């Protein structure tokens, strides 16, 4: 290369510039694909953490760093409260491709090497940046793919408009389309390390845990379960607690301790890890054994259920932090009274339904003992229904799951909840006959003794609990104060406050 004064030095050092592309973290526009998993405010907090971390890394590399955000001048003070940039630039263009091209075109000069990257990469490292600039010495374009089929970094020595004119930027064909354009233009390119761009809840979980192959297993109002593969490709469960039914601040720790206490039962999931300090994830979580099986069939699997419950109830336990209710009937009644108040105070109550509820409450109030001593204390689930069982090919290959509300109590409470009509009817249309209940208890008694009188008292209270909960939920769903997940749920709740159902279970309160 020749200049006015003759030949330039053999090594010509290009100026290395970094363009950091980011959104202004705002609720409603930031990480919106995470809103089915976390609150908008939490999504903003995650974006801010990633922006701070990645800006700090890039600022330490002694390159020219230019921050382009999607806001305007009014957003600069807020952005400055997050990162100490001397100046901000504004993204402009009709789409993401236009915005990236315009940014590179505006800052690149002869002799520059420019890379542009997003701000929310979980695994950004100095090596990624170093390799990008190094390879720009020998190729036209460098690319770092993201795991979702797109890319998070692109670098070049001159702006090339066609590279950014892709059909779309919102699907898994982005990288493929980009490479096609590059090849058609006869450009040389280098593909670097893959980055994790956090867009979905699976991305967030992978960034937090390092686990791979994360897939949703099941979600409820209080917990969300995912499967993942560990380093040895063994399938496990990641369980996240989002809210506590027991109003506990340490809900996931409580369930983890329960699983530890029950691990020798051989019929519950083995717990692995408990994580309470997280970097990005706003929830605590535990990992546990993945178990195969189907839901319990009340007509075919009662022998297995008797065996499983006895294994749980017969498990010896050491000193622990599980809640032990000294007078469970008083606590159950208080809970039921509070739930029933929601319906009984409703201006749209059905007078006849309210009459049934008051009758049931009155009967249970009479049955509350002044003093009560738990006999033969054991670990109980307290919420057993057909969905709490995973039935395999045999009783030894079957399990009891979901231990978020375990207590130290009496086996009769578990048995009564499991057999109560308000339980069996919830996920099925089955109400066990008196003979079927007695047959199950006979099978259970082959493994463990139970007290018939205590069982019958618990049975009545569990019927009350089911009815009062449904009456409360019926009002909440009717007023749209509770998110309705599906029509089946509302129809089932409605059936629990129907005259026919209430009359059918009123025999338990005679």
Predicted features along the sequence, with ranges:
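ATP-binding pocket architecture of kinase catalytic cores
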Residues: 221-334, 374
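Active-site acidic catalytic loop and adjacent metal/ATP-binding pocket
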Residues: 217-229, 237-238, 365-413
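Conserved donor-nucleotide/metal-binding helix-loop-beta segment in metal-dependent transferases, i.e.
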Residues: 124-148
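An alpha-helical support segment within catalytic cores of ATP-dependent transferases
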Residues: 209-211, 317-382, 386, 392
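Active-site activation/catalytic loop segments of kinase-like enzymes and analogous catalytic loops
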Residues: 413-449, 462-480
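A glycine-centered beta->alpha junction motif in the catalytic cores
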Residues: 26-27, 31, 243, 277, ...
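N-terminal nucleotide-binding beta1-loop-alpha1 segment
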Residues: 14-34
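ATP/Mg2+ or Mg2+-diphosphate-binding catalytic cores
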Residues: 468-510
């Amino acid at each position: 290369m020749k200049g006015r004064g003759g030949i330039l030095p053999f090594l010509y050092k290009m100026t290395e510039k970094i363009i950091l592309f980011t959104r202004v973290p705002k609720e409603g526009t930031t990480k919106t694909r995470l809103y089915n998993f976390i609150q908008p405010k939490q999504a903003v907090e995650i974006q801010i953490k990633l922006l701070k971390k990645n800006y700090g890394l890039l600022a330490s590399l002694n390159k020219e760093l230019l921050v382009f955000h999607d806001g305007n001048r009014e957003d600069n003070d807020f952005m400055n409260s997050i990162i100490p940039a001397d100046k901000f630039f504004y993204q402009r263009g009709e789409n993401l491709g236009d915005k990236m091209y315009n940014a590179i075109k505006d800052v690149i000069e002869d002799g520059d090497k420019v890379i542009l990257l997003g701000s929310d990469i979980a695994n950004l490292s100095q090596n990624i940046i170093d390799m990008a600039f190094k390879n720009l010495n020998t190729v036209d374009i460098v690319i770092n793919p993201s795991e979702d089929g797109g890319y998070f970094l692109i670098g070049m020595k001159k702006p090339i408009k066609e590279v950014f004119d892709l059909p779309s930027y919102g699907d898994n064909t982005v990288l493929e389309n980009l490479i096609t354009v590059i090849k058609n233009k006869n450009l040389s390119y280098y593909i670097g390390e893959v980055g994790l761009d956090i867009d979905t809840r699976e991305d967030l979980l992978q960034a937090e845990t390092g686990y791979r192959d994360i897939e949703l297993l099941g979600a409820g109002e209080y917990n969300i379960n995912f499967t993942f593969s560990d380093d040895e490709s063994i399938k496990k469960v990641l369980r996240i607690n989002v809210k506590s039914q027991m109003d506990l601040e340490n809900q996931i720790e409580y369930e983890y301790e329960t699983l530890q206490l029950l691990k020798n039962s051989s019929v519950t999931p083995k717990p692995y890890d408990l994580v309470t300090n997280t970097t990005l994830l706003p929830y605590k979580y535990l990992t546990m054994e993945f178990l195969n099986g189907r839901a319990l069939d009340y007509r075919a699997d009662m022998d297995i259920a008797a065996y499983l419950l006895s294994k749980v109830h017969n498990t010896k336990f050491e000193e622990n932090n599980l809640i032990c209710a000294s007078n469970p009937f008083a606590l159950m009644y208080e809970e039921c009274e509070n739930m029933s108040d929601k319906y009984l105070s409703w201006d749209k109550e059905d007078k006849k339904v309210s009459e049934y509820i008051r009758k049931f409450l009155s009967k249970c109030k009479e049955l509350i003992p002044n003093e009560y001593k738990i006999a033969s204390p054991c670990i109980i689930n307290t919420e057993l229904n057909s969905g709490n069982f995973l039935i395999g090919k045999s009783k030894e290959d079957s399990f009891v799951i979901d231990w978020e509300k375990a207590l130290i109590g009496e086996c009769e409470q578990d048995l009564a909840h499991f057999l109560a009509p308000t339980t069996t009817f919830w996920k099925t249309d089955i109400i066990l006959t008196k003979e079927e209940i007695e047959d199950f208890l006979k099978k259970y008694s082959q493994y463990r003794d139970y007290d018939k009188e205590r069982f019958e008292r618990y049975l009545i209270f569990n019927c009350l609990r089911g009815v009062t909960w449904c009456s409360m939920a019926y009002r909440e769903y009717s007023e749209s104060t509770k998110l309705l997940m599906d029509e089946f749920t509302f129809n089932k709740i409605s059936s629990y406050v129907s005259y026919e159902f209430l009359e059918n279970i009123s025999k338990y309160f005679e």
